[in-house]
Amino acid sequence: MKIATVLDLIDIGSMALPEFQRGYVWNREQVRGLMHSLYKKHPVGSLLIWVTKTETAETRGDGALPPGTVKLLLDGQQRITSLYGIIRGRPPKFFDGNAEAFTGLHFHLDDEVFEFYSPTKMKDNPLWINVTELMQIGSGKAIERLVKIPELAPNLSDYINRLNAIDSIKQIELHGEE
């Protein structure tokens, strides 16, 4: 199942978190590591999903569930919550934890590293890209900014490839056991 599909299922309430699951406990280092692994196309584990009847499902959060069945995320919650927060720019409906763990992630186009926003390091540096902004609006706006800076021209094709690689993380297939 593609990452984008999982996030869409959460948005419409067809995938939820069972009430017995713990809250979100990941820290920024774990989130950064996840994004680095996905960027490098390394495996990040599978999802364990329990399909059950909506009327008997006890879930976290206040999101409405669809009639019929719902997919409950039994394993993979920390990864999916992190990805949801980075890609959507907000926590999912079932969120219980510290949203700072996935807020403000940036990527450096030369060094190919993910780091969380630091104004002294990143402000006014066009090589630091806001990952959430990139995921939400695509690479076009970032490319437009880079094209206007003549000294970046020699590396522009590499930068475009890296931007597209990050944006394509949404299309990565995660193995899901149902």
Name these PLM-found stretches.
Residues K2-E178:
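Basic- and aromatic-enriched surface patches that contact anionic nucleotides/nucleic acids
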